[in-house]
Swiss-Prot record:
<dbReference type="GO" id="GO:0030425">
    <property type="term" value="C:dendrite"/>
</dbReference>
<dbReference type="GO" id="GO:0005765">
    <property type="term" value="C:lysosomal membrane"/>
</dbReference>
<dbReference type="GO" id="GO:0032715">
    <property type="term" value="P:negative regulation of interleukin-6 production"/>
</dbReference>
<dbReference type="GO" id="GO:1905171">
    <property type="term" value="P:positive regulation of protein localization to phagocytic vesicle"/>
</dbReference>
<feature type="domain" description="C2 2">
    <location>
        <begin position="290"/>
        <end position="425"/>
    </location>
</feature>
<dbReference type="GO" id="GO:0001891">
    <property type="term" value="C:phagocytic cup"/>
</dbReference>
<feature type="region of interest" description="Disordered">
    <location>
        <begin position="79"/>
        <end position="120"/>
    </location>
</feature>
<dbReference type="GO" id="GO:0098691">
    <property type="term" value="C:dopaminergic synapse"/>
</dbReference>
<dbReference type="GO" id="GO:0001778">
    <property type="term" value="P:plasma membrane repair"/>
</dbReference>
<dbReference type="InterPro" id="IPR035892">
    <property type="entry name" value="C2_domain_sf"/>
</dbReference>
<dbReference type="GO" id="GO:0001818">
    <property type="term" value="P:negative regulation of cytokine production"/>
</dbReference>
<dbReference type="GO" id="GO:0006914">
    <property type="term" value="P:autophagy"/>
</dbReference>
<feature type="binding site">
    <location>
        <position position="249"/>
    </location>
    <ligand>
        <name>Ca(2+)</name>
    </ligand>
</feature>
<dbReference type="GO" id="GO:0032720">
    <property type="term" value="P:negative regulation of tumor necrosis factor production"/>
</dbReference>
<dbReference type="GO" id="GO:0031369">
    <property type="term" value="F:translation initiation factor binding"/>
</dbReference>
<dbReference type="GO" id="GO:0031982">
    <property type="term" value="C:vesicle"/>
</dbReference>
<dbReference type="GO" id="GO:1905162">
    <property type="term" value="P:regulation of phagosome maturation"/>
</dbReference>
Amino acid sequence: MAEITNIRPSFDVSPVAAGLIGASVLVVCVSVTVFVWTCCHQQAEKKHKTPPYKFIHMLKGISIYPETLSNKKKIIKVRRDKDGPRRESGRGNLLINAESGLLSHDKDPRGPSPASCMDQLPIKRDYGEELRSPMTSLTPGESKATSPSSPEEDVMLGSLTFSVDYNFPKKALVVTIQEAHGLPVMDDQTQGSDPYIKMTILPDKRHRVKTRVLRKTLDPVFDETFTFYGIPYSQLQDLVLHFLVLSFDRFSRDDVIGEVMVPLAGVDPSTGKVQLTRDIIKRNIQKCISRGELQVSLSYQPVAQRMTVVVLKARHLPKMDITGLSGNPYVKVNVYYGRKRIAKKKTHVKKCTLNPVFNESFIYDIPTDLLPDISIEFLVIDFDRTTKNEVVGRLILGAHSVTTSGAEHWREVCESPRKPIAKWHSLSEY
């Protein structure tokens, strides 16, 4: 009798591997279930309450919400009453929907006042600065030029003690900055100063040194000696020691306390060390009749309603301090509607030159009807890494131009659309 054999299917997967696969499938299923449940739970919560993630970023007073981050901000003119009687201000009506960035028509037949128009501009708070007119910005009591009896001249800035010596074998000038007394308070919180001194030998300006910073004192004792080699004794009479006294500021640019100028023509260190004490005086910013010239080009595209401003170059800019260490100019361009600033841009800094070439262009969206009320201000500024920047001069083109050349340039731009018009303009005092 034949033998019957039962053939059963065999599997190569071991029990351990099968267990791992099963566990993995179980973990995936549980994860998917938890994810779906979480999404459904969040959707249900959003329908019943305000989302908790709404936030506000403060960028100089502007609130930006998530739902409006993608909106564009444009300066757009709704209408200008040409046929009707003009308001006393003589300015057009400017309305902008801050939520959508689109036009909103003025339903008031009289139109909003210029002030209300500017309040609706979706622009930064500091853009609301007023345009300072050279004729009206300063009253006689607010003149920038300090009169002899002004309080600024009466402020005592302290004194500086130092010594001058000459090393004949090494042909070296030796200057020791010893101490200062009676410095003014530069930090209201600590009622003190963090003084240090920068020293420069004029007029070549090749030798520049500075002391360490002494914290919270009005009577610093530096006692630091600096040796300048390669200075023949015969040239000492032509040199001037310039001491600039500053107060260190951790969070902003250092404050200038004052300066001391010492011509070596009246000092004879041939017989030994000469000790001197000089009063610290207010920093002497050079006043000059000419502020230099600036060349700019303007062109207006009426179809695109865009104004292209090109800052080309400047020439004959003055040195802004007596040391002649300045000469890092850049140009800041401000656009005003009426007297409210609505846009600002600036060029790059040009290092160590009084005749800079910029060749930088800026584009502004300006409706045609707004041109009579638009002014463009150019501020030529001298960049200073240590102290505050100083305005070299100013030029205004447009509605508030105070010069004949500025008014003529603006008129040509408005009457010759699509044509770039470049002109030189003399800078005025800011």
